[in-house]
Curated annotation (Swiss-Prot):
Changing residue 515 to A: Does not affect trypsin-binding. Residues 75-82, 140-161, 220-276, 349-361, 607-620, 668-709 are cytoplasmic. The chain crosses the membrane at residues 1-21, 54-74, 83-103, 119-139, 162-182, 199-219, 277-297, 328-348, 362-382, 586-606, 621-641, 647-667. Residues 697-709 have a biased composition (Polar residues). GO terms for biological process: dipeptide import across plasma membrane; oligopeptide transport; protein transport. This is Solute carrier family 15 member 1. It is a multi-pass membrane protein. Belongs to the major facilitator superfamily. Proton-dependent oligopeptide transporter (POT/PTR) (TC 2.A.17) family. The gene is Slc15a1. The extracellular domain (ECD) region specifically binds trypsin.
Amino acid sequence: MGMSKSRGCFGYPLSIFFIVVNEFCERFSYYGMRALLVLYFRNFLGWDDNLSTAIYHTFVALCYLTPILGALIADSWLGKFKTIVSLSIVYTIGQAVISVSSINDLTDHDHNGSPDSLPVHVALSMVGLALIALGTGGIKPCVSAFGGDQFEEGQEKQRNRFFSIFYLAINGGSLLSTIITPILRVQQCGIHSQQACYPLAFGVPAALMAVALIVFVLGSGMYKKFQPQGNIMGKVAKCIGFAIKNRFRHRSKAYPKREHWLDWAKEKYDERLISQIKMVTKVMFLYIPLPMFWALFDQQGSRWTLQATTMNGKIGAIEIQPDQMQTVNAILIVIMVPIVDAVVYPLIAKCGFNFTSLKKMTVGMFLASMAFVVAAIVQVEIDKTLPVFPGGNQVQIKVLNIGNNNMTVHFPGNSVTLAQMSQTDTFMTFDIDKLTSINISSSGSPGVTTVAHDFEQGHRHTLLVWNPSQYRVVKDGLNQKPEKGENGIRFVNTLNEMVTIKMSGKVYENVTSHNASGYQFFPSGEKQYTINTTAVAPTCLTDFKSSNLDFGSAYTYVIRRASDGCLEVKEFEDIPPNTVNMALQIPQYFLLTCGEVVFSVTGLEFSYSQAPSNMKSVLQAGWLLTVAVGNIIVLIVAGAGHFPKQWAEYILFASLLLVVCVIFAIMARFYTYINPAEIEAQFDEDEKKKGIGKENPYSSLEPVSQTNM
């Protein structure tokens, strides 16, 4: 064992402050990056909701599978310190790679605002995420245990407080990052064109990871560094493998039965190890239903974020971005953990109710299930406000009269008459095979003009008319609400020459006469824009201001010549803004956070209390593995489900967890609590009597009651 001399501050080893700061920065880096992923996949890489959700949960699953690799490296090869440093370097490189992958100008050679080679961005993103998963997962089982190693015997009180501080550092980093990085994302940046600033939003977490690494290395001279003492997970696996093999070798009736299947390892392994593995397998058996909880919990960053994009983020004077709603969980965690520990549990105990660890975990599962019932109710309310878009064999048409006369448009079975500068109230829906003819007429002009156009099924179209014989059909290109709560704006030019419009850093270039531009998308708020044209006198006003944009709307701005010869702009609503407020997500976040506090914190404490001293790392890896399996469950459901309504998927998850909750309650009913310390003390006593007096070579890992490891 190699160690440095321990220096103290307020009764704590000075080294632990470097570890706490490192953990704060690392969690800021991880959660700041993770908060952006789903919207980055959908809006930058152009993936649909299901693929975005699937890749997101694949990444999270990898982050919770790699701790097994990290524990193996630390235990059998590098030790905790070198493992943390080495994998933190990998982690930092991964964060830098994904930041570079989000630079639009990397492949935007024609400077049109869109990447010319999306596969390059996808490849870089996947490489970055793979490196991050290896780095963050690999250091997970090492950092908290390394912090525990810094304390001397007799410092149990300080060690327990350290883990509380460590837990708050994790949630503090998570909270700040999920507030800050979405703000950075909505900024506009770019060399040749302006887009959502993903490079900055990913770059700040990358910088924080570099800071985390530097801070950790600066404390190197103060750390106690234990040499690797052998791979206990390997010993456990070999013992279990030998027991199974030996049992099948001796399965005939000629061999007497043994009390436990692990007793078949006695020919090769000592009773202490076998007894310790029995304790671990009892807890591991209880882990079997747990992934279902994580399958629901980790959807905060995917489905719930996507749900928030269809809601209104104005809460009083505050304006919240969809990916910032995840901060509600971190805020509630910081508030509720001390309240539950100091108030709720003591009150329950005073009432005489034996609220055991497994009962707490059962309640946590139930609360998470109810959170998804609430999410389903909110989704039903959202669905009521969403516009209806055309089906596969339908088209939708809106008529916009941009002329100076009244116009009548005749559809099969229906006619609409529009005054000058007006549009139909809604999009009209037609089956494509029944849309046989469309005719335009005007009371001031003789004759009827037939609209000759092949409407594209499954899409919305705008029919621009300005006199009975002149019209233009424009395919809108919007078949859903604008993504990430932004607002779509397009311009219609009624002048006799081309115009160019600049709005908040984006350019609508060369919009031809009596034609419409494509939509461009902007966050909420008022937007300044300038119309460049030579069609009006230099003294005329060319700078204008939009209305106060809300969330998820779309508008058409018609540019026309006013009576004084200058320009005027009229606004028409294409898609109404979101009306269901994001505040309605708070109850589901509250229920899920309550479930997290009583499930996750209790689960780790229970696992460690029931584990032998030298196998706490084994159970820590097993606990993290349940998170990985939970994300794999989401992958399977998202890939195979394809529910027509999102609320139905929420109800499915709630029902599955409720069933699992009942199963877990039954399993918990038959579980017998043990005291591993007493069992190990008995082995020590027996060995002393036999004159063996072996010292257990494996140091214990202290439990860390935290949910965001």
